[in-house]
Structure formats: C-alpha cells, structure tokens
C-alpha cells in the first residue's frame, strides 16, 4: 500500500476527483460533502449486480456516503447528498473492516466499493486494513465514471475489476442532470485508463466470478434514447467494440426528489426496446436488464438493511 501517503496528501488540497476542488479535507469537506474521515452508509451482501460480479452468494458492497456528482435522479440520494452522518453509518476503519469481515464470513469473495471516486484515499486504507487482517478479497471499483485518470493510475494492481457507469454522451444533458461540466471528455479519459489497465477481456474463475476486467454500465433515461445510442457508439468507437457493457433499465423517479419532464416518469417499453436493438446490432458483449428491474432495485438507506425493505 505504498500509494497511501500520496493519496492522503491529496486531501490537503483535494485533487482526488476531476473537480480538483482544492478543499483541505483534513479540516473541512470537499465539493463531495465528505472530509478526510471515511463515511460509509452501508456494508451489505448484495445479489443485484451483474452475474459475474454478484456470483452465487453475492458481493460485499461498501456504499460510501457523499458523491462528486449531483444526479437529479439519483437512486441513492439518501446517502449521496449526505448532510448529517446517520447513527448507523460507519466512520472508523476498524468498524468498516469488521462489517466487511462479517460479509466475507457469509461467503462473499469480493468487495465492491460503491461511489468511491471521492473517497479513494479512504478506500485504500480500508483495503490495507483488510490485508493487515489476512483478508484478500477481490476488489471491485463501482463508480459513476467521473474519475480522475491520475487517481486511477494509483489503483493499478489494487483494483481487480472496474465497474464504472458511462451516463452521458451529451455534455449539455450531463450538466442539466448531474450539475457537471465536461462529463463526456472526463469520463471517456477515465474509461481509457481503466481499459489500459484491464483491456476488453473479462477473466472469470471456476465459479464464473469476475477476477480481472472492465464492465461499463449505462442506464437508459426516459426521453433520452438518443443519448443512450450515442453513448453506446462512443464506447465502441473510442474505447473498444469488444467492451463488456451492462445495459440498465432500472430507472425510476426516486421518492423524495422533485423531477420535471421525462425524468418524472418511468422508462417506456418502446424506449428501452429501441436502445436494446442498437445494443444488439452493435454486437456488444455483456448483459441487458429486463424492463421490470425498475420494480426491484429500490434501496432504502434509512434502514440498516437497505435492500431488504
């Protein structure tokens, strides 16, 4: 874990994610709303990921609080827009590692860090604590895609599987929905770095669990099928036509958020069918969710068991 001193120092004038907000997170919070302290909203066994990620038992997912994006439709908005640390959240490396260890005892062989882009330094210290305990699970980096290539380079040899999202092929849409500039160029550069490290192959073990590779996710947004088709084409043309792509249909307007226009409604069958047809025509490898998935993936992070409510 020789990377740790370098990443800890980046929090003094934060450059961990592409915003490079410059905050001293040792004395305050960054644009993400998080200080140098780890803030984990949930550690749980999760079976809802892609088959080679979940495996037969499930993956131990570590859900970081805060986020470097502000997506208007965020399904995890209860934790991504954290203002107050909730009593059941974890804020010490010992407590986080204890919870992960409990999951691993239940049979999980991989740990997925969800929304890690702004807590990479903390993530590495969690991994170091696991290694100190003699635990060496596979590490999955499950991000929104708005990652710093410089930070990702420090993760080479630490992360086994990258699982980023690629949300937009349209910067105007990215700004309107996620409040971010230059998403397309930034996310494409991050994906290029992940691809440099992993290539297009997905290496599976004897249990059909991903041990090494890259899977890119794309969530289809209602009323924005042109964005989805453009995103798939961009992935094939600028990264690789042999990428493993997970096409997601689980969009729903989250409770508690005020959304206007098409984002206020579910995805329609004809919209998803149009994107799925393009996906199949391009010959991309991967997985496509059923449209009904929107009825099942509705976590409640006010509960200590967010996926069991």
Enumerate the predicted regions with their spans.
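Conserved AdoMet/S-adenosylmethionine-binding subsite of the radical SAM
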Residues: 97-261
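Glycine-rich phosphate-binding "P-loop"
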Residues: 81-91, 110-115
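Short, conserved acidic/polar surface loops in the N-terminal third of protein domains
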Residues: 72-76, 83-87, 123-126, 151-152
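N-terminal [4Fe-4S]-dependent radical SAM core
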Residues: 1-68, 72-83, 302-304
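Short Fe-S-cluster ligation motifs
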Residues: 41-61, 95-115, 284-286
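Auxiliary Fe-S-binding modules of radical SAM enzymes
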Residues: 1-29, 199-309
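Short, compositionally biased "basic patch" segments
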Residues: 66-77, 90-102
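Short glycine-enriched, charge-decorated loop/helix-capping segments at active-site entrances
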Residues: 78-88, 176-181, 259-266
């Amino acid at each position: 874990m020789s990377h740790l001193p370098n990443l800890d120092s980046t929090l003094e004038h934060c450059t961990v994610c592409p915003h490079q907000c410059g905050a001293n997170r040792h004395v305050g919070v960054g644009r993400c709303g998080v200080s140098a302290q780890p803030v984990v909203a949930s550690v749980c066994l999760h079976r809802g990921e892609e088959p080679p990620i979940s495996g037969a038992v499930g993956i131990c997912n570590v859900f970081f609080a805060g986020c470097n994006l502000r997506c208007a439709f965020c399904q995890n908005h209860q934790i991504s827009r954290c203002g107050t640390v909730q009593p059941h959240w974890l804020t010490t490396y010992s407590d986080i590692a204890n919870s992960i260890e409990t999951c691993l005892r239940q049979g999980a062989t991989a740990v997925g860090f969800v929304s890690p882009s702004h807590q990479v330094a903390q993530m590495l210290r969690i991994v170091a604590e696991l290694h100190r305990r003699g635990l060496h699970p596979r590490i999955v980096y499950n991000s929104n895609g708005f990652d710093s290539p410089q930070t990702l380079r420090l993760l080479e040899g630490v992360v086994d599987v990258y699982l980023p999202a690629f949300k937009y092929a349209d910067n105007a849409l990215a700004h309107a929905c996620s409040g971010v500039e230059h998403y397309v160029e930034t996310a494409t550069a991050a994906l290029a770095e992940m691809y440099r490290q992993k290539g297009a192959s997905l290496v599976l073990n004897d249990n059909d669990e991903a041990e090494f590779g890259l899977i890119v996710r794309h969530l289809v947004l209602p009323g924005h099928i042109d964005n989805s088709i453009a995103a798939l084409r961009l992935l094939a043309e600028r990264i690789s036509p042999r990428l493993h792509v997970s096409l997601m249909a689980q969009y729903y307007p989250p409770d508690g958020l005020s959304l206007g226009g098409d984002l206020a409604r579910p995805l329609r069958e004809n919209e998803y069918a149009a994107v799925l047809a393009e996906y199949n025509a391009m010959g991309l490898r991967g997985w496509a969710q059923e449209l009904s998935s929107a009825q099942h993936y509705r976590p409640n992070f006010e509960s200590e068991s967010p996926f069991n409510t």
